[in-house]
Regions:
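C-terminal helical subdomain
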Residues: 177, 193-232
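Conserved glycine-rich cofactor-binding loop
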Residues: 9-11
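The beta1-alpha1 cofactor-binding region of Rossmann-like NAD(H)/NADP(H)-dependent oxidoreductases
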Residues: 34-35, 57-68, 99
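Substrate-binding pocket helix/loop in short-chain dehydrogenase/reductase
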Residues: 93-94, 98-106
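Conserved glycine-rich Rossmann-like NAD(P)H-binding loop of the short-chain dehydrogenase/reductase
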Residues: 23-40
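Residue(s) in the substrate-gating loop at a strand-loop-helix junction
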Residues: 137
Length: 232
């Protein structure tokens, strides 16, 4: 299968790439940071020689980069799976955060998925099959202090995912929203939170991979995951 994963150089994106690479699939991955992407690509190819790893630097907060990345993926074939993972978390209070934070969070966390999907999904529609995963967040489901514009952008991403599900279900295309709680990535380093208190990125990757193993007539609409002891 041809699997497209955005924001795949670290964290959940890299863990998802590993889950599909170990199964020998062909991957198209991207990251905003070229050096991290190069390192991730080399690591994946070395660890999983039976997989084929294609990579391209792209800043998906920019529509032009979404279109360029999408067209590049299509030049390699029709994707079977699209995992919209690109984005970032910036904590803050709505009345105190810096000017333009909302715009940057919407661009990174919503527009990236919107424009990348618009570039790739028409080929899936033509093929009559495909599976799209949108990496939302627990912050898509309820508000919390310091959620700020990040939470707003993730609520919007949930709306995008739900609408996409309704539009594509009669075209043979599955859409799954993924709602992870606290997951240990580099952003937690130095936070004082023990890694054992929160989930591993591999936990989310395993659930995403499992959701792709169902019959064509079955879909997991939502994957909600939290640390065993609950949200922080």
């Amino acid at each position: 299968m041809l699997v497209v994963i955005t924001g795949a150089s670290q964290g959940i994106g890299y863990a998802v790439a590993e889950a599909f690479a170990v199964a020998g699939h062909t991957l198209c991955i991207c990251s905003k940071t070229a050096s991290r992407l190069k390192e991730a690509t080399e690591s994946l190819q070395k660890k999983y020689p039976n997989a084929i790893i294609h990579s391209k630097q792209a800043d998906l907060s920019k529509q032009a980069d979404c279109n360029a990345f999408g067209n590049w993926c299509l030049s390699l074939g029709t994707p079977h799976i699209l995992i919209n993972n690109a984005g970032f978390f910036l904590p803050g209070n709505l009345m105190e955060e810096e000017q333009d934070v909302l715009e940057s969070q919407i661009a990174a966390n919503l527009y990236s998925a919107y424009h990348t999907s618009r570039a790739i999904v028409p080929a899936m529609i033509k093929a009559g099959a495909g599976h799209i995963f949108n990496i939302c967040s627990i912050a898509s489901l309820h508000a919390y202090p310091q959620g700020g514009s990040y939470s707003i952008s993730k609520y919007a991403l949930e709306g995008f995912s739900k609408n996409l599900r309704e539009e594509l279900k009669d075209k043979g295309i599955k859409v799954t929203g993924v709602y992870p709680g606290a997951t240990y990535t580099n952003s937690w380093a130095g936070s004082g939170v023990a890694p054992s208190r929160i989930m591993e990125a591999e936990d989310i990757a395993k659930m995403i991979f499992a959701a792709t193993q169902l019959s064509p007539q079955a879909v997991v609409e939502d994957i909600v995951m939290r640390p065993l002891l609950g949200d922080l």
